[in-house]
Amino acid sequence: VPEGAPLGPVLPAPEARKPFARARAEGKFLFAGGEKLYVRGVTYGTFRPDPDGHEYPSPAIVERDFALMAAHGFNAVRTYTAPPRWLLDLAEAHGLRLLIGLGGERSIGYVCEGRWNAEHERAFLDAASECYGHPAVLAFAIANEIPASIVRWLGAKRVERHVERLCTLVRRRDPGALVTYVSYPTTEYLRLPFLDFHCFNVYLEQREKLEAYLARLQNLTGDRPLVLAEIGLDSVRNGEERQAETLAWQVRTTFASGAAGAFVYAWTDEWHRGGEDVYDWAFGLTRRDRSPKPALDAVERAMREVPFAPDGDWPRISVVVCSYNGSRTLRDCLDGLMRIEYPNFEVIVVDDGSKDSVSAIASEYDVRLIRTENRGLSSARNTGMEAATGEIVAYTDDDARPDPHWLYYLADAFRRGTDSGVGGPNIVPPDDGWIAQCVAASPGGPAHVLLSDQSAEHIPGCNMAFRKRALQSIDGFDVRYRTAGDDVDLCWRLAERGLPLGFRAGAMVWHHRRGEVRTYWKQQVGYGRAEALLEAKWPERYNALGHVAWAGSIYGSGLSRAWTLKRPRIYQGSWGLAPFQRLYEPHEGTLASSILMPEWYLGVALLAVFALAGVFWAPLRFAIALFALAAAAPLALAITNAARVRFPYPARDLRERLLRRPLTAFLHAMQPLARLHGRLKHGLTPWRDRSGAGIVAPVARGRSIWCEEGRPAAERIDIDAN
């Protein structure tokens, strides 16, 4: 754009702003200064280089562009190269944060040739030397879309290690900065758990396909935030009106999926690439002279409604919190509920005969308090359901704190679909102690089971919502489950009625884990008891050893993985050109999986008896070696699983850094023992009688049946059976 060319309306100088707080990734979203930060972004560049090699317009043009962006509701800008310091200062002055591309994909050739060295690392870091520590930096994107052909040539593991190495370099240079990598559907199989948040470029022009793929990406990213680094549509081939319409629903769909942010590609049609100005693409919200297209107003309206428009017909929701002696965490739960942003809801607290200060704490808040005698969790939940005035009943635990937009995401799922119930993720809070962080990284925590990216087989009780009429149709919760198992039983009964369950990643709650090893043991013993109760009611869902055969996949942190010699498979299509390339995990073998089962320890105990006998009787001395191997196997697997853990938050001190991984390994080894104790104590044994007929001797028996008239043989057998 020539100097002095029209660049849109003249805007007043920006008002003085308070200094930026650095962004943090917590759970499924980004936060800054204690407030949630939805990234409402637009991409910028690349432009024809100036004499200094910077691929940006002059400061006057950049300032006008940034002023227009801020005026239209944007709060973030994505650049593809490291900007000069003056551009960062201008961004901060206009309230814009920058996602800065460091161009790591441009040097991938050195990795292919095996020539990547310390000199290349210094050059990579020095390119952004003016950016480190600047308050306007949202995050550094260390690379953008390493080509699928290169990833296939090098191998996914090698690329993952290279990306992790680049992330480590940036973190050492700027310890407080967020770091990410921008991927795309063709390399979605890259496993990058070390990123602070995940970015994808996604261009899908049908709403249903975008909704489905966003749900998939949310499951791939797990407990980390998801940001779409590029969405957009070319107005040359599709027209400006269709571009505006498409971008509006792309933005709304992205944020409705629970994404933490989105960048619209691009701010302007002006684009320089490969040494030439590009004229046959026009993805910009403004034209080359910065005159606005219809898409600019459409995107502005959509961005200002993030995550949802408050107006509209939002269903009434009754939030039910049941508590028995939960005063330690109840206040945090109710504080979170008081910060809920939703136009039509109520909070009901059911005090299930507590002996502590639950009722006193609840009385301090604007909630409906119901006191009952101690009848157990299921009964308390039924009491809350009966008192609810909403058409949707949402349950959370007294040790959980919902996200401010929790109810919006749940309600949107009910409005869009026919699910009878909807759940969401439960994530350990960043302020939980280090032992609680280790517990969260260990097995046995509340986890959701998904049949597909949006359909659930099970949703945990700390974060679940149901249509009230669906709960009433099955008479609510089964009161035999006093502390655990009620949510599993309810989900199975709904499934029996053909009532589906859904899952939404944005409907997040912070869920405190047990803060002591002793309480973790007690919790797992209780879960073992609940398994015994469930097996007694649902024997057809359990195998001979007393374990559930889930039809879906279990999601959540702390899952134990068995050893396997099989490698994951990547579907890459003919010539490696499939646009969506997926990773398929190998099936774990029976022997490897059995090491994870509580009953493995029964085998270890039996071998211990034989090994002890072998000390005194030579023919049984082989049992000593078998016992040593059997006892060492779960310990070695626990150490392996603990080594794989990626703690979401850094250690606070040296003691924590040294102890949390050994403690996690100990909890992985201990958890099956606790479950075994609870299962055996309440009759869930491998030798239990599953038929209900007792022990019957295997001898032939005869019986006489008198029939007044002839009957077919099959009918005579039925008469005998009855």
Model-identified regions with their sequence ranges:
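Aromatic-rich peripheral "rim/lid" segments of glycoside hydrolase catalytic domains that contact
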Residues: 4, 265-313
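Active-site mouth of glycoside hydrolases
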Residues: 29-195, 274
